Amino acid sequence: MPDYAIGDIQGCYDPLQRLLELIDFNEKDDCLWFVGDLVNRGPDSLAVLRFIYSLPVKPKITLGNHDLHLLGLLFGGQPWKGHDDTLEEVMLADDGEELGHWLRKQSLLCRSSELNIVMCHAGIAPLWDLSKAVGLANELEAVLSGDSYHEFFAQMYGNKPDIWSDDLVGLDRLRVITNYFTRMRYCDAHGRLDLGYKGTLSKAPNHLYPWFEVPCRKEIEMDIVFGHWAALMGRSSHPRIHAIDTGCLWGGQLTALRLQDRQRFSVPGYGVSRFE
């Protein structure tokens, strides 16, 4: 009964099915961990959601920024971001709202002491130890799954505040927790988020670090599995930090990491021209 962590799918249903065939997935016994960004930009977000929703063994899911964007559209009155969104089919589906309510009750962080694994979409903020990260994930999850979710989704967008403080309260506190868990790539030496630069590591400004290389980063006792950052192509500088977004939608691959032995499996994704 192996566990597999699956990288960012982003509505790429066919590559997901090919990947599950490659790993000889047994839906009655195996457990899938989804690192988030199940939806958007790819052609089959509705099929992806329906498939994962129907799995007989409950999967572990950490929400990504595109998943939260869908929830903002469904429940927060958020406007369409632009022509790159491919969520209309979900929005118009008879079961779209049902799938949304299921999605908003998923996690920001999943962990297993037995497997020595913690998973979240973008990573763990350099300023947080594992206990702090778990507590803050639980705090945000309670809002997403509770009665005040409409208010949160209506106001979740924004780049400020951009650094964690225990003194933060209200929506500012929830927003920075959200941004660390779902949007983070680069931080400065003090752990401050930089959500503006999205280029390559080689061209990054000197004052910015990948979140897992920030000098003040607190050590996490477990191996970390994260997605969100296709440009890394599955590589990080740390042997216990596993990047599994390998750019399925952008001419790369869709990757699964078997958590028992950290072995990787990949299938080709879509070429960029697929959506031009």
Swiss-Prot record:
Catalytic reaction annotation: P(1),P(4)-bis(5'-adenosyl) tetraphosphate + H2O = 2 ADP + 2 H(+)
InterPro entries per record: ApaH (IPR004617), Calcineurin-like_PHP_ApaH (IPR004843), Metallo-depent_PP-like (IPR029052)
Domain of life: Bacteria
EC code: 3.6.1.41
Pfam family name, one: Metallophos
CDD domains assigned to the protein according to its UniProt record, in alphabetical order: MPP_ApaH
Root EC class: hydrolase
Family: Belongs to the Ap4A hydrolase family.
Name recorded for this polypeptide: Bis(5'-nucleosyl)-tetraphosphatase, symmetrical
Protein source organism: Legionella pneumophila (strain Lens)
